[in-house]
Structure formats: C-alpha cells, structure tokens
Amino acid sequence: MSKQIKQNFNSGDLEKYRTALEYARKSKQSFQIVSTGLSRKIIMPNGYKLNYFGRKGAQNLVEGAFLVMMVRREIDAYIEKNGTPPQVEPTQVQTFNFTAIRKVLSGKRKPIVGVDINACYWFVAHKLGYISDTLFERGLNTKKKKGLLIAIGCLNKLPMIKTYQDGVCIDTSFDTAQHQMYSPFYWNIIYHTHQLMIDSFKVFGDDWYMFLTDCLFVSIDRMKDAQEFLKEKGFFYKNHTIEFKTFDAKNITWFDYKDMKIKTMYAGSRDIYFFEKVYDEKQRATEVAH
C-alpha cells in the first residue's frame, strides 16, 4: 500500500501569508486563496494547501484555535450520519428588561448579579449532539474560552475565494455551498440559547434584567435560584456583580465589578417582552401546525 502524501500544511501567521502571497504573485503562479476571519488558505494547482492563521506573535494567536478544524471534522461526521439540521431563523441572544432597569435607576436600587454560563455554546453544541463526548471534554480541558467561541462561530463564516492566474486575481466569489452546509448548526446552537434566555425570563420575571450572549443578570436575592435553574439545564456557572448607571432609551450603561470598568451597550428595541411575545406566537403556530 502506497503511503499517503501530506497535502495540508500549517504555514504560519498572516504576516507569513502576506509574504507567500507576494512571492506567488511576483513569480506569476496560479492558485486560489480562501479567506475567513483570521485564517487564509492558499491552494496550489497540485492540491497542496498552505494554511495561515492569526497575527504575528504568540500574544495575537488565539489559544485553542486548533479546535476549529476538530469541530469541523465532527460536524462533517454528523452530516454524513444524520444530514444537516433544519435551518432556523437568526435569533437574538442579547436582550434587556427595560421596565426593570428603569425601576432600578429610579431609586429602587438593589445589587444585580451576572450568572455567567461557562462555555455556553460549547455545552449547547454537545447537548445537541454536534460534537462527541471526547471533543467536548478536550475543549473544556483547554480552558480557552476564546478558542471554544471561535470553533463554534466559524460554523457561520462565509468563505471568500480569490482565484489567481499567472499572478493576477481574475475572480472573487463566495463559498455559499459551504456556508449553507455549516451555518444551520451555528444558528441551531444560537436558537437553543435563545430558548434558554426566554425560559429564564419566564422564571424570573421582574427580577430578570438582561441576558448577554451567555450571561443571565438577576437580582442578587435570586442568584441561587438562577444558579439552580442553569444547573437543572445542565450548565455550570460563575458570578459577578454589576451596577446600572444610565439608560437613555438607546444605550444602557453599567459598572462591571469583575472587570472594574464602565460598560455601555446599545439597547435599541431589544426589549425582552417583545422577544417573549414573538417566541410564544411561534410556539402556538407550531402547536397548531401539528
């Protein structure tokens, strides 16, 4: 049996990519470049793939980024066995309880606690069966939060492809087929988190202040209840305290005692009551359809 020849190479950071690109152009080579986020892949006519990732220097390299390809391989295995999950509409996982926040700022102040869900999207991907127990545990053991987030976030990337002929770019396109294959996994993970957000609001009501991606904010006297709620859902957590400062109908500002700094976020029309209403209407429509 002939030995398989390696064709995929990790070739360095983006600075090395720019050097390689400049050389390939000057030497009038023909090749393709696939770009997503901080990653670049140069595909040569002989099939060799030169992979580049991250900015120069160890401090700029996202720790745990190696999980991206591991997740992709397991998603490929899932597709081969089960197919692609149904596409769901993009949903919001950053919402606010405008009424409760205004009440706090009107003088009825009480401490607010953020209950951070550890590796939220990673846990959801595992709960949905998208990644194996082995990869799930390996990811957690890295203790690299950014790496876990990027590994899931990359499922929704739309790769850009540039085709070079004799060193000149002759075409730019997007790999919509790849995006259509992987993005449903990402949005199902987000939708499951959205459901968690809605469920938490139904439980905590006026003691629920906001939900930011993977953190539930409640009154301090409901902290243990929030922890138990998340524990029952299969999540782990850690806590930090915040204090709301202002709400001008567009932006909400608070002091974060974990990071010891002021934070501001655009609130717009992201009132949890609206999203609860939309969610309930969809649930009723689904029940009628069945």
Where are the regions that the model predicts?
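Conserved acidic
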Residues: 1-290
